[in-house]
Amino acid sequence: MGEYIVTKTLNNNVVVCTNNDQEVILIGKGIGFNKKEGMALNDQTITIEKIYKLESEQQKAHYKSLVEIADDNVLQVIIDSLNFISNTAMNVDSKQLVISLTDHIIFAYKRLKQNQVISNPFVMETMQLYSDAYHIAKQVIDQLNAALDVHFPEDEIGFIALHIASNTEDLSMHEMTLINNVIKKGIDIIESDLVTTVDKESLQYQRFIRHVQFLIRRLRRKEYIHAQDDFVSMIKNHYPICYNTAYKILTMIQKQFDVNISESEIIYLTLHIHHFEERINQS
């Protein structure tokens, strides 16, 4: 790993160093204790848990400001959480995650201590779309609760799952939130048009949100599907209510993501909505 020269000690667990003229952040339990500017460090004399090379000055400044306002025990739990996530089977870009997750947990903890809880309307959607990330996030929350002697609500599992998933998917946090929002509004339209309550534990729900997720990705890549004209006519005639509902949902997607919608897309979404209708008729 070479030699690191301390340029700033942020707290007992984090130091900023230079290594071959590259500024890096070293993280490890007690790594910053009694460390002064100009001291030389190496992996023979200290235990380095993580090394981060933050690319931009903005990233560096933001991370430094976060570390400076965090208690040592909170930061250590965050470090442990990042290590836990990095060691899972998911291909997480920990360099990107370190800033977003540190930021999120520090302020989520502060809000919790002040009894200011932010609700997450997309918990169910996140659980279904990003089940692996959600499972890991739940374990992270369990660890945070135990280490900090607090009780983060389930909403936080959803938020952290999105942070994890956004570092494994080809979508940003903003895009993933938009997709969750579209799915939620789509379910609202279905419930209104079919006069029902959608069971979010059902196979129909899981298939629907997966279809919408991949539909949006496909449309953004300009990958279109095609259905035969006679098949289109048959579905429109057989399931007029479901077709109308699908049209509403896809019109919303078209406006939200600025994509082109074909008749074939409406037809295939109609079939997914019809599964909800079938379930109603069977009950």
UniProtKB/Swiss-Prot annotation:
Keyword RNA-binding assigned: no
Origin species: Staphylococcus aureus (strain bovine RF122 / ET3-1)
Record's keyword terms, sorted: Repeat
Domain PRD: 69-173, 174-283
Keyword Ribonucleoprotein among UniProt keywords: no
InterPro entries in the cross-refs: BglG_antiterminators, CAT_RNA-bd_dom, CAT_RNA-bd_dom_sf, PRD, PRD_sf, Transcrpt_antitermin_CS
Taxonomic superkingdom: Bacteria
GO annotation, biological process: positive regulation of DNA-templated transcription
SUPFAM superfamilies assigned: PTS-regulatory domain, PRD, SacY-like RNA-binding domain
Family note: Belongs to the transcriptional antiterminator BglG family. GlcT subfamily.
Stored NCBIfam families: antiterm_GlcT
GO molecular function, one term: RNA binding
Protein name: Protein GlcT
